[in-house]
Amino acid sequence: MSDLILQASNLEKEYRDGKLKTPVIKGLDFELRANEKVAIVGSSGSGKSTLLHLLAGLDKPTGGTVSLMSQAFSGLNEVKRGRLRNQYMGFVYQFHFLLPELNALENVMLPLRVRRTPSKDAEKQASALLDRVGLGHRIHHKPSELSGGERQRVAIARALITKPACVLADEPTGNLDESSAQQVFDLMLELNQEQNTALLVVTHDLKLAAKMDRQYQLTEGHFILPSETL
């Protein structure tokens, strides 16, 4: 069985305003394999978030293909794309997007409840994962009662609760101070190893990116050759 999780081939994306065309991604190829940790870095406006949305099947490319677990998004309707994402992907964003009316435990349980996991089983799994990320004593607190770092830990737990094949993270530490950012990022790397989950992170922080197995610099719609980190 192939260990290839996510693949993009000759990927292109352009935006149009009347006759004006603005290319953002230009003929890009990319692969993410099982258990890999990969960072995409680039300046603001370089197209990093656009690329992540394309790789997640959340946006349609102008050209080329994206495949998740050997299934091309282009060959699936919206419902089937959603099912494929929900089965194999987890997401962490710069803004945590936790539901404010739910506590930490309930937020982490949500993906399991969507899958119709029995409530008691979902609660047990969510509680154990929150304990693993250091929030076992905060499971009944709502997002407004948590610090920025704690909220992001809850978001990480929510992304991992279904044991996805890969996690896509868009500036996951962008709203945190340096100390909290280091702690949260290191936690993501630890969980990547523990759960055998591939990790793709978009970040502007070169120090954090240096901790990954591979780095890609996105410049003018292309990747500069990846550098292998030691």
Swiss-Prot record:
GO-annotated molecular function: ATP binding; ATP hydrolysis activity; transmembrane transporter activity
Keyword terms: ATP-binding, Cell inner membrane, Cell membrane, Membrane, Nucleotide-binding, Translocase, Transport
Lineage, top ranks: Bacteria, Pseudomonadati, Pseudomonadota, Gammaproteobacteria, Thiotrichales
Intracellular or extracellular location(s): Cell inner membrane
SUPFAM superfamilies referenced in this protein's UniProt entry, alphabetically: P-loop containing nucleoside triphosphate hydrolases
Residue ranges that the Swiss-Prot or TrEMBL entry lists as coiled coil: none
Record: residues binding ATP: G42, S43, S44, G45, S46, G47, K48, S49
A Pfam family reported for this protein in Swiss-Prot or TrEMBL: ABC_tran
UniProt xrefs under NCBIfam families: LolD_lipo_ex
Subunit description: The complex is composed of two ATP-binding proteins (LolD) and two transmembrane proteins (LolC and LolE).
GO cellular component annotations of the record: plasma membrane
Species annotation: Hydrogenovibrio crunogenus (strain DSM 25203 / XCL-2) (Thiomicrospira crunogena)
Family note: Belongs to the ABC transporter superfamily. Lipoprotein translocase (TC 3.A.1.125) family.
EC number: 7.6.2.-
Membrane topology recorded in Swiss-Prot or TrEMBL: Peripheral membrane protein
Protein name: Lipoprotein-releasing system ATP-binding protein LolD
Function noted in UniProt: Part of the ABC transporter complex LolCDE involved in the translocation of mature outer membrane-directed lipoproteins, from the inner membrane to the periplasmic chaperone, LolA. Responsible for the formation of the LolA-lipoprotein complex in an ATP-dependent manner.
Location, primary (coarse class): membrane
Every ABC transporter domain range: 6-230
